Each structure stands twice: as C-alpha cells, then as structure tokens.
Amino acid sequence: MHRIVSVVAPLGFRLQAQPLVQSRPLSSVQDVLRRTPLYDFHLAHGGKMVAFAGWSLPVQYRDSHVDSHLHTRRHCSLFDVSHMLQTKIFGCDRVKLLESVVVGDIAELRPNQGTLSLFTNEAGGILDDLIVSNTSEGHLYVVSNAGCRDKDLALMQDKVKEFQNRGLDVGLEVVENALLALQGPTATQVLQAGVTDDMKKLPFMTSAVMEVFGVSGCRVTRCGYTGEDGVEISVPATGAVHLATTLLKNPEVKLAGLAARDSLRLEAGLCLYGNDIDEHTTPVEGSLSWTLGKRRRIAMDFPGAKIIVPQLKGEVQRRRVGLICEGAPVRAHSPILNTEGTVIGTVTSGCPSPSLKKNVAMGYVPFKYSRPGTQLLVEVRRKQQMTVVSKMPFVPTNYYTLK
C-alpha cells in the first residue's frame, strides 16, 4: 500500500535511487523538508536521510539494506512511517461519506476492524490506496499515502463540505501523531512486554487504543507493508522518541529504512502507489478486485463503478502480474516482451529478492499472457532476459489470524 521510495539494490550491493518516485540525498533542500518527530533519533542512530515526498526520511541505517531486510523476515524491525497521512472522519454520516469516495464496504466493518480500500475516480482509476478502521470510539481512522496527501485531503474535505451543505452530520480531522511500524515474526512478542492488552486477541486488520510502554493514547493496528506479522502504532508525537528508544532496547528489534521497506513489500506482492497502481489503472487491472465490496458491486454506487464492475465479468485488456526474472536485476520501466520479441507490457517495480536470491518484479501484460507459468522476456540495458509469470506473493505472508 504505502508509497515509499523505490531504492532497492542488487544483492551485494550498491544502493541506487530509482527516479520514478523521487528521492535524493539531503543538500540544499534540507530546510524545506518536513521532519518526523524521530528526525534527530534517526541521525543519532546512523540514519542515512533522503528527501521523499517532501519529508526527510531514513533510507537505511548502519546495517546494509539486505541485512535490514533479512532481519525483518527473521526477527523484527522498526520503521518510521510518520509521513503517512492520518485522518479521522466522524459524525453520524461518516460511513456514507467515506463510501462515496472508496470502493469498499465500510458499513460491514465490525468495531475496530479495518480493511484496505481504494479511492477511485469516475474513469475507474485508482486515486490512492488507504487503510480504514471502524473504531469503537465513534470515528473512522484512515491512513493514506504521503505522496497523495494534498489530493486525498482535498477529496475528503470537498466531500465533507458537500455533505454538510446537504445537512448531513460529518467532520474531518487530521491526526498529527507519529506512526511507527514494528514488523516481523517477533514483533508482537516484543510489543506484548509493554502492553496490558492480550495481543493474541488482536488479529490481522484489527486495532485497539492502549498504553504502550508507558505512552498512553496509542492506536495499535495489526497490519503492515512487509508481508510479516506486525503492527502500526499511531503514537502522540511527544511520546514517539520514548517509544522508539524503548523498543530498540530489545535485541530482537533493529531500525530499518525505506530501502528494506520497498524490497519487503515487493516480495509480499504489495503495490506501490505511483508505480504499480495509479489514476489510469483500475482495481481489476491492478489485481485488486478483492477490495470491491460485494454490496458495492451490486449497488454500483462508488466512483468509476460503471467502468470497473463490467471488467469483473469479462477479460480486461491488461493485468498486473508477478515476474521471476533471470539475469541482471529488472527495474521499473523495463519493457516486457513475448517470446517472439514483441513489446507487450512494462515492468512497474523490480528488485533482487534478498529472501529468494532471485530477481522479482511486477508489471502489466495483456490478459492472455497473465497466466502463471507463462514464459516471457524482459529487456534490461538493451539485452533480453528470460522471465516467467509468477503467482504473488513471492514470499508467503505471515499475517496473524485467530484460529
């Protein structure tokens, strides 16, 4: 989901910044960048800061990108994702408001249950992806992408004004908390030491407000962007450094930056907004049909429904697929060809997989080439390499569900 810089590098590696989602070392832009509450904390721990989406964020720390990636898969890592836009939608008509701009069935969410959903336009394109939680405190808690902050806020604020002008009860508030992601197989074991709530009773895509290592008012959501078990903690900004410092005292926990986050999400088959999905991609083309609520499909009452719903019943022209590639690492914008050498699509994300020690990628191909096992070619530095369409995720996910 979350839009991050595409800065993964070959195994063994020299870190490279990819130009599609801009990130650059801090220089003259430093003074105009926003800083998270953990900025000084990152510097003190060797964070290599880059400019991303108007923020100064760590791309990695003293450990290599690959070390951080593998540590997350085997133990757990702490990511600062405070640049994400956090909002509350409240009022009696809050569900009706959000359902006017997203494709999901928000009304069916139980108290403190969440889901991934999509903002769409009337042409069926994806404006952004978001996580929405139906809190037991009487509001919807929404987390969306930093790179889409302005357009997401404008979309929601315009809808609030429209609904209020119609006499409906809605409101919107930006949450100025920090947001920390603790990800990996031992993440909740680490967290359990600092909370009184039983983490075994908090399954994937549910949340609760609790005190975490002495910091009150934290919303803990069992979700993440790595494919591993883990949580995202919305923490009051004044408590962010204390919480991060306390978590880091546990030997299971290491800091990780944008580079590891990108390769982890790609192994998990998760989309990067702006690369893998955008305003010209429909949920069906993006292999995200599961985000469309069944009730919403029948009612056809979400933006772009007249375009999107018919695609569910027939073949779309193109489809997002996974690719396992031979040869050199494959990057975004690399052409995809059929075995006759005709260009049929484009890679949208790619990197060497530290877990698999293979090159993995995502891209779009015509529907007839989207079946797993289909042999194709990719072009890297003007040379053609064999690739095969693969099921995703590339690495099995480990989300926690109640037995």
Curated annotation (Swiss-Prot):
GO terms for biological process: glycine decarboxylation via glycine cleavage system. Its EC number is 2.1.2.10. The keyword Repeat does not apply. SUPFAM superfamilies: Aminomethyltransferase beta-barrel domain (SSF101790), Folate-binding domain (SSF103025). It is an enzyme of class 2 (transferase). It holds the Pfam family GCV_T. GO terms for cellular component: glycine cleavage complex; mitochondrion; nucleoplasm. The modification N6-succinyllysine is found at K368. GO terms for molecular function: aminomethyltransferase activity; transaminase activity. It comes from the Eukaryota. Residues 1-28 form a transit peptide. Coiled coil: none annotated. Substrate binds at E232, R261, Y399. It catalyses: N(6)-[(R)-S(8)-aminomethyldihydrolipoyl]-L-lysyl-[protein] + (6S)-5,6,7,8-tetrahydrofolate = N(6)-[(R)-dihydrolipoyl]-L-lysyl-[protein] + (6R)-5,10-methylene-5,6,7,8-tetrahydrofolate + NH4(+). It is found in: Mitochondrion. Keywords: Aminotransferase, Mitochondrion, Transferase, Transit peptide. Belongs to the GcvT family. The glycine cleavage system is composed of four proteins: P, T, L and H. The glycine cleavage system catalyzes the degradation of glycine. PANTHER family: AMINOMETHYLTRANSFERASE, AMINOMETHYLTRANSFERASE, MITOCHONDRIAL. NCBIfam families: gcvT (TIGR00528), PRK00389.1 (NF001567). This is Aminomethyltransferase, mitochondrial. The gene is Amt.
